[in-house]
């Protein structure tokens, strides 16, 4: 995903 911790 757009956020590293929200892959």
UniProtKB/Swiss-Prot annotation:
GO terms for cellular component: extracellular region. Expressed by the skin glands. It is found in: Secreted. The keyword Secreted applies. One of its GO terms (biological process) is defense response. Belongs to the frog skin active peptide (FSAP) family. Tryptophillin subfamily. Putative defense peptide. This is Tryptophyllin-1.
